[in-house]
């Protein structure tokens, strides 16, 4: 009835949204939330106006706009066709690809650069004091600095790209389009690097869409430009010497952090990335302990609990899980980890591993933050909170039973080959981009690759 009164008051159109900032993930739904997650709301509004025969002030049906993860042309089109809404509203999908509408209209859906719902650039950068950007579109927010069309290379070069993750792919695509002869080498049988592994859980469907987009762009670029791709190829110094490239771009990722915990030899131990690729290694393991409460650890926990029905515990030595992640994404995942029965232990240090469990020192003080709190920390890491209370220590030693221990402690930049190439002068120009330069997110990997590719 409130909406009916608004129509009488002169409202011409309704944007039907959901959520408030007590649950950050609803006002701007992150990765993991279903496509078209708020369509039920717009449908309810449309049915209300139809049932009560309420017309707009111009005598037509009251227009209702749907919003919320509608950057999928098939779902957006179906919502309008089925009468669930009259229009759809897009925001983040247009940051990822300003030509979304034109490509959808032309039927070139595979060429739409998809939003991955990470909110690394559009929300997090803004919160940290910057301006809205985009993890998958480096031009967003920098349109004056980077023209829409690439400037042709002044001197065409033979370039080798070592590594087929998001950084290597982004560089290869742009450099080839600018006229360089580019050869990309990938040691595995598929492209994608860390995003290929990270897109395995069902909730990571947005990342899978992005990977499919990159693969499609590579196919088109190989057909139209001087781009060659060699998968299942390990690059050596000898190979680079033999080819005599003008430039070599290293983009081969990180080394996994594997601390020398006491008892690691006897423990049933596996890296989180290895388990994602080989879930059969968790067969027979009911109680699983994950060491590391970053994004990989928490997403792996959700995957194990929801797709394989495992009892999962995640250990994190810091006060908060997934530090640095956008509050919406972080809160959404924490909320569903709690609903899935995943045990989160923060302020917990691993002391030793055993065949049947993990020995830890856990701070059980009442001042330790609630690990399931979806809105803490309240302020970004670059702004100190004067109201934040100090965490006191009440350390308790305990053993957490485990049939399988999963290490998800992140990785560090693997610069070994880069420095070796420099010492041996394997090319006139040698660069290091992506995680092999500095372990980071899709945002940093794509941005760094783009900045180099447009000027080399």
How does the language model describe each region?
Residues 1-162, 166, 170-182, 190, ...:
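Flavin-dependent oxidoreductase catalytic cores
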Residues 8, 59, 81, 177, ...:
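Residues at the C-terminal ends
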Residues 11, 84-85, 245, 309, ...:
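A structural motif
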Residues 31-34, 83, 105-108, 200-204, ...:
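Short, hinge-like loop/turn segments at secondary-structure boundaries
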Residues 119, 123-166, 177, 191, ...:
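Extracellular/periplasmic ectodomains of large secreted or surface enzymes and adhesion receptors
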Residues 156-184, 230-241, 252-265, 273-327, ...:
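Rossmann-like dinucleotide/flavin-binding elements
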Residues 181-228, 301-350, 437:
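Rossmann-like dinucleotide-binding cores of NAD(P)H-dependent redox enzymes
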């Amino acid at each position: 009835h409130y909406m009916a009164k608004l129509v009488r008051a002169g409202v011409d159109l309704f944007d039907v949204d959901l959520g408030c900032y007590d649950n950050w993930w609803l006002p701007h739904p992150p990765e993991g939330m279903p496509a078209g997650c708020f369509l039920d709301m717009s449908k309810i509004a449309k049915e209300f106006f139809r049932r009560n025969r309420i017309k707009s002030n111009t005598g037509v049906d009251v227009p209702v706009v749907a919003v919320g993860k509608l950057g999928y042309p098939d779902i957006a089109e179906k919502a309008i066709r089925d009468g669930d809404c009259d229009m759809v509203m897009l925001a983040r999908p247009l940051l990822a690809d300003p030509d979304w509408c034109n490509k959808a209209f032309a039927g070139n859906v595979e060429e739409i650069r998809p939003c991955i719902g990470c909110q690394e650039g559009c929300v997090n950068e803004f919160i940290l004091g910057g301006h809205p950007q985009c993890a998958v579109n480096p031009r967003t927010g920098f349109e004056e600095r980077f023209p829409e069309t690439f400037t042709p290379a002044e001197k065409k070069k033979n370039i080798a790209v070592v590594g087929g993750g998001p950084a290597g792919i982004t560089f290869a695509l742009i450099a080839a389009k600018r006229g360089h002869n580019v050869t990309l080498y990938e040691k595995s049988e598929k492209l994608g690097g860390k995003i290929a592994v990270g897109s395995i859980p069902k909730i990571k469907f947005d990342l899978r869409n992005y990977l499919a987009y990159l693969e499609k762009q590579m196919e088109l670029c190989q057909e139209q430009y001087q781009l060659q791709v060699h998968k299942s190829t390990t690059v050596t110094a000898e190979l680079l010497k033999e080819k005599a490239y003008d430039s070599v771009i290293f983009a081969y990722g990180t080394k996994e952090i594997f601390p020398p915990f006491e008892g690691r030899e006897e423990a049933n131990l596996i890296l989180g990335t290895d388990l994602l690729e080989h879930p059969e290694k968790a067969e027979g393991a009911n109680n699983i302990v994950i060491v590391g409460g970053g994004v990989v650890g928490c997403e792996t926990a959700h995957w194990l609990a929801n797709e394989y029905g495992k009892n999962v515990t995640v250990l994190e030595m810091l006060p908060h899980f997934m530090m640095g992640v956008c509050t919406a994404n972080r809160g959404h995942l924490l909320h569903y980890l709690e609903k899935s029965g995943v045990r989160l232990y923060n302020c917990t240090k691993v002391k030793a591993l055993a065949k049947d469990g993990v020995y830890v020192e856990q701070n059980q003080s009442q001042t330790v933050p609630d690990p399931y709190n979806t809105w803490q920390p309240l302020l970004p890491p670059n702004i100190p909170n004067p109201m934040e209370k100090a965490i006191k220590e009440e350390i308790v030693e305990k053993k957490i039973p485990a049939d399988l221990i999963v290490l998800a402690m992140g990785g560090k930049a693997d610069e070994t080959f880069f420095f070796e190439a420099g010492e041996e002068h394997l090319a006139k120009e040698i660069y290091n981009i992506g995680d092999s330069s500095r372990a980071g997110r899709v945002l940093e990997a794509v941005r760094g690759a783009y900045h180099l590719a447009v000027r080399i």
